[in-house]
């Protein structure tokens, strides 16, 4: 079954409002084994909406439309669908009843403009809106079934779940395909390298698809398939997952789509370990990442942004002589920072960073992009020194934080 999604509204078309509806609908359809071919957006124009509906219905099995069902003059979707289907608008008893019930339950008066929402294309099936005024509807146009829903996200989600998907599943009948997917997370490789290593995917795994997306500095690889039965789909997804791990290598750290901070948290829980962080160049970003994971209070104990040298001395017990001799950005300093924060917090591990995020502050010996990382644990302190610059302060800080988290992750393996 081939599906397309059509969003209507000037605000969506102009980018004033982000179209989160399309993303949600696509995820639900994919989970049901339905292939989503296109997302389309048009403004509040009767002719444009009608033309888009006509065009899409010529190539799709189902069309899901959002927006334009309200009582105002710019709510044109119902009329546009009727025009595309060459149907007249008629008062739908079910739509009228659901609207009256909505207003009575809330002790509100139904306005004359609201009655417009009960007018549906002739032959349409009303889809009741349990939490709003505007009913949705389903209308067959040749081989394509059109489902029209409100643009308000919570109303759309409710209608999609209770009124639209059950009808689509009925349309699928015995021809339903079952979807399975896995998402693998990568850190430490550029996107181009990951793409090169994925080059043989299609030949090695017929019937599987993959997609790559980047959320700097992580890369997510999603493998997916649609098969006649769920067991086959899941087995193929598992095989694809193993293939990706082998081809991409140890830079793959999760096959459950976890972000690095979540994977570190999982490993800390598994090890019954705790962590404390002393940050200089990352400015609290590591702590923010770790505490953004639900349940992080089980393993995250303490964070200190010891930006000034004196703070490193006063809070962490770093020797002034160490800073004077080696500088704040040095393996010697982060060694004492990591050891100090571990001691102060009583944590299993102490993690520390000090570096030069830029755009200024670099020297020939320590250019912008230099970061030193220290990790103190039960078996001592390890340090590392890396120089990787993206000539962007925010990106450098984020990269430094992930390098530190990766250091901890590898220690926990």
UniProtKB/Swiss-Prot annotation:
Signal peptide region: none
Pfam entry (one): MoCF_biosynth
SUPFAM superfamilies assigned to the protein according to its UniProt record, in alphabetical order: CinA-like, Molybdenum cofactor biosynthesis proteins
Gene3D superfamilies from the UniProt entry: CinA-like (3.90.950.20), MoaB/Mog-like domain (3.40.980.10)
Highest taxon listed in the record's lineage: Bacteria
InterPro entries: CinA, CinA-like_C, CinA_C, CinA_KH, Competence-induced_CinA, MoaB/Mog-like_dom_sf, MoaB/Mog_dom
NCBIfam families from the UniProt entry: cinA_nterm (TIGR00200), molyb_syn (TIGR00177), PncC_domain (TIGR00199), PRK00549.1 (NF001813)
Family to which this protein belongs: Belongs to the CinA family.
PANTHER family to which the protein is assigned, alphabetical: NICOTINAMIDE-NUCLEOTIDE AMIDOHYDROLASE PNCC, NMN AMIDOHYDROLASE-LIKE PROTEIN YFAY
Record-given protein name: CinA-like protein
């Amino acid at each position: 079954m081939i599906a397309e999604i059509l969003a209507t509204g000037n605000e969506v078309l102009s980018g004033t409002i982000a179209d989160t509806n399309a993303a949600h609908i696509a995820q639900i359809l994919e989970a049901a084994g339905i292939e989503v071919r296109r997302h389309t957006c048009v403004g509040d124009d009767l002719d444009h909406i009608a033309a888009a509906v006509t065009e899409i219905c010529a190539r799709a099995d189902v069309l899901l439309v959002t927006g334009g069902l309200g009582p105002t003059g710019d709510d044109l979707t119902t009329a546009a669908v009727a025009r595309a289907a060459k149907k007249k608008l008629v008062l739908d008893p079910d739509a009228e009843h659901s609207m009256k019930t909505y207003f009575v339950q809330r002790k509100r008066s139904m306005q004359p403009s609201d009655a417009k929402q009960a007018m549906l294309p002739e032959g349409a099936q009303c889809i009741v809106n349990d939490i709003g005024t505007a009913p949705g509807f389903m209308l067959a146009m040749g081989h394509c079934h059109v489902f029209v829903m409100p643009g308000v996200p919570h109303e759309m989600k409710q209608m999609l779940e209770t009124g639209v998907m059950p009808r689509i599943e009925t349309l699928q009948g015995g021809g339903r395909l079952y979807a399975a997917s896995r998402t693998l997370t990568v850190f430490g490789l550029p996107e181009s390298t990951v793409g090169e290593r994925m080059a043989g995917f299609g030949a090695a795994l017929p019937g599987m698809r993959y997609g790559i997306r980047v959320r700097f500095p992580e890369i997510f690889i999603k493998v997916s398939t649609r098969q006649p039965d769920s067991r086959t789909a899941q087995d193929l997804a598992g095989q694809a997952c193993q293939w990706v791990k082998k081809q991409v290598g140890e830079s793959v750290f999760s096959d459950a789509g976890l972000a690095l901070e979540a994977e570190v948290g999982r490993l800390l829980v598994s090890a019954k370990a705790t962590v404390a962080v002393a940050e200089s160049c990352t400015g609290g970003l590591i702590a923010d990442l770790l505490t953004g994971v639900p349940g992080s209070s089980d393993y995250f104990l303490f964070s200190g942004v010891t930006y000034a040298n004196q703070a490193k001395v006063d809070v962490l017990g770093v020797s002034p002589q160490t800073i004077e001799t080696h500088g704040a950005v040095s393996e010697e300093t982060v060694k004492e920072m990591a050891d100090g924060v571990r001691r102060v917090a009583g944590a299993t591990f102490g993690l520390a960073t000090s570096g030069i995020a830029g755009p200024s502050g670099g020297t020939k010996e320590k250019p912008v992009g230099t970061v030193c990382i220290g990790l103190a644990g039960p078996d001592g302190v390890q340090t590392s020194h890396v120089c990787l610059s993206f000539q962007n302060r925010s990106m450098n800080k984020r990269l430094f934080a992930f390098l530190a988290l990766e250091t901890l992750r590898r220690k926990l393996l």
